Structure formats: C-alpha cells, structure tokens
Amino acid sequence: MPKKLKKQYEDKKMTRFSSYHCAYACDSAELPFHGDMVIEVPEQYRDVVPADYFLLREFSHEKSFAPEGKNILQTMTYCKEDEAKRFISLSRDKKAYKERKQKIATAIMEIIANKYPELNGKLDCLDVWTPATYRRFVNSEIGSWMSFALPPRTLPLMMKNKVKGLKNVILATQWLQAPGGLPIAASSGINAIKTILKREKRRSAG
C-alpha cells in the first residue's frame, strides 16, 4: 500500500463510510415533495435507524421508473465504518440480517408517513440494501462506494499511482484521492493509461 494511503487509513480524522437504502413503491400520482428531502430521524426510531437524518428522494421526473399514477421513493442513510462492519457481520446470519432489513424498512416507512400523512398506507417496500450488499457486488471492504469523508478545512491530496518497489504496477482507484467516487475513479483510470503510455514511449525510444 502506498505510504500516503496508509497514512490516511491510520488518520482518525479521515472517516470511511457507507450507507443503507430502502426503495418503496408509492401508490400515488401526486407527491407532497419534489426532488430530495432531508428527513430527521425521531428519537424513538434511533435504535433501529441510528442516524440523525436520512435522504428521501423521488423519481417522478423518470417516467419509465413506475407505472402511470404511481411513483418510486428511495432513502439513503449514511453509516460510519463500525456500523457498516456490523451489517457485513450480520449478513452471515441470513435470518437475522433479513429481520434487521425489515425493521429498517418499516421504521423508515413510518417516519415518512408521519412526515407526510398523505402517503400513509400508500408505501410498499421493494428492496433494502446495505453495506453488505455493496461488499458482495464490488468487494469493497466495508461497502464503501466512495473513499474518505474529508474533515473540515482539509484539501484533497492526489496520490501517485505507482507503488515503490513494485515494477509494472499502476493503480487506478478512487482511493487515490478523497472523497473518491465515480468521477475520481474514472480520472484515475485515465491517469493510469497516461502513465503506461509514457513508460511505453520511453521504452520504444530507448
């Protein structure tokens, strides 16, 4: 592992994170909100949803996402590294993991219905996915879909894509620059290609 990346892993200020999500079919053509909403988690639900807030998103602008007269809602709740690891550990017990997801889906559905009474009885859970889901699909250690959350007053540093002591190894990953994500991963891939082309050019010139 590059020294700078190892240093970030060891820096307590640099936080790794993941998230868990719920998707609901909404039996209503009209919604009481548009776009994204930040919803506070009431105290009585925080044993099941241990977060201050979650993001609620609607997709009415995507006409092909739901039949006419209906909508799709999706929630996203961020979680830190420890909680992400608990999800991954729990997923080894299929029954307990399924029950945990059902509790989350029910709690969040109730929170939404309390916030928007006009949606009460009109939501049906389609799916719940967690850090364990991301780990299963992309083999990310804690289900990270981005790298590190940047602390306040911190500038993201771009690390070199070469590892000292390893010949012909070029890294292309979101972890080379916080906060990661798809654009940085794509840029990292472009930089890896440029590095390879430079090396090949030197070899052909020599």
Regions found by a protein language model. Give the residues of each.
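A conserved FAD-binding loop/helix module that cradles the flavin
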Residues: 166, 174-200
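A glycine-rich dinucleotide-binding beta-alpha-beta segment and adjacent secondary-structure elements
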Residues: 114, 118-178
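Mid-domain catalytic core of redox enzymes
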Residues: 1-68
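A generic secondary-structure signal for well-formed alpha-helical elements
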Residues: 29, 83, 116, 196-200
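Flavin-binding catalytic cores
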Residues: 30, 68, 72-73, 93-132
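Short coil-to-beta-strand
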Residues: 69-80, 165-167
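Short acidic/His/Gly/Ser-rich catalytic and metal-binding motifs that mark active-site loops
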Residues: 82-88
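Acidic/polar loop patches that form or flank catalytic/metal-binding clefts of enzymes
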Residues: 30-37, 119-123, 201-205
